[in-house]
UniProtKB/Swiss-Prot annotation:
<keyword id="KW-0687">Ribonucleoprotein</keyword>
<feature type="domain" description="S5 DRBM">
    <location>
        <begin position="19"/>
        <end position="82"/>
    </location>
</feature>
<comment type="similarity">
    <text>Belongs to the universal ribosomal protein uS5 family.</text>
</comment>
<dbReference type="InterPro" id="IPR020568">
    <property type="entry name" value="Ribosomal_Su5_D2-typ_SF"/>
</dbReference>
<dbReference type="InterPro" id="IPR005712">
    <property type="entry name" value="Ribosomal_uS5_bac-type"/>
</dbReference>
<dbReference type="Pfam" id="PF03719">
    <property type="entry name" value="Ribosomal_S5_C"/>
</dbReference>
<dbReference type="InterPro" id="IPR000851">
    <property type="entry name" value="Ribosomal_uS5"/>
</dbReference>
<keyword id="KW-0699">rRNA-binding</keyword>
<protein>
    <recommendedName>
        <fullName>Small ribosomal subunit protein uS5</fullName>
    </recommendedName>
</protein>
<dbReference type="InterPro" id="IPR018192">
    <property type="entry name" value="Ribosomal_uS5_N_CS"/>
</dbReference>
<keyword id="KW-0689">Ribosomal protein</keyword>
<comment type="function">
    <text>Located at the back of the 30S subunit body where it stabilizes the conformation of the head with respect to the body.</text>
</comment>
<keyword id="KW-0694">RNA-binding</keyword>
<comment type="subunit">
    <text>Part of the 30S ribosomal subunit. Contacts proteins S4 and S8.</text>
</comment>
<dbReference type="Pfam" id="PF00333">
    <property type="entry name" value="Ribosomal_S5"/>
</dbReference>
<dbReference type="GO" id="GO:0003735">
    <property type="term" value="F:structural constituent of ribosome"/>
</dbReference>
<dbReference type="GO" id="GO:0006412">
    <property type="term" value="P:translation"/>
</dbReference>
Length: 174
């Protein structure tokens, strides 16, 4: 199962409605009952439109395809919008969930996605093309995806910062 998961991690599953879909992890789970063990599968996926929208979903089922399908449907329902700046983020941000923490910084055009594991899949589906990211602490895929989405939710545009400070955008950059 670990070999199958390693091959499947971060692979595009196949969009039908213009959304980008990535499967991040598949785990075999066991429920112990009086008569023995019941085996099942849990899937973690992310879905994005390539233009700033992203959603995360989890699904469980007795079979892998059904678990992946449930996860994709949940990810579509949980989509949120992130503002991007020329294929990157506006400023350095940090996010945390559980013991997983991530740091992201904007990168100039042509840098590419410098990130590993589940973070790379999130950036690819959201439409980020240039970013530098580093994860610290836990490498649990579920917590890393949540920490990544938490960090992206803290990204503010210059107009949002100016409005909050009661200044104009020009006054921010003086």
């Amino acid at each position: 199962m670990a070999k199958v998961q390693a091959k499947m991690q971060g692979k595009a599953v196949g969009p039908e409605d213009g959304l980008r879909e990535k499967m991040i992890a598949i785990n075999r789970v066991t429920k112990v009952v009086k008569g023995g063990r019941i085996l099942g599968f849990a899937a973690l996926t992310v879905v994005g439109d390539g233009d700033g929208s992203v959603g995360m979903g989890k699904g469980k089922s007795k079979e892998v395809p059904a678990a992946v399908q449930k996860a994709m449907e949940e990810a579509r329902r949980n989509m949120t919008k992130i503002t991007l700046k020329n294929g990157s983020i506006h400023h350095k941000v940090m996010g945390q969930h559980g013991a997983a923490s991530v740091m992201m910084a904007p990168a100039p055009k042509g840098t590419g996605i410098i990130a590993g594991g589940p973070m790379r899949a999130v950036f690819e589906v959201i439409g980020i093309t240039d970013i530098v990211a580093k994860s610290h602490g836990s490498t649990n895929p579920y917590n890393m995806v949540r920490a990544t989405l938490d960090a992206l939710s803290h990204d503010r545009t210059p107009s949002e910062v100016a409005a909050k400070r009661g200044k104009t955008i020009e006054e921010l950059f003086v």
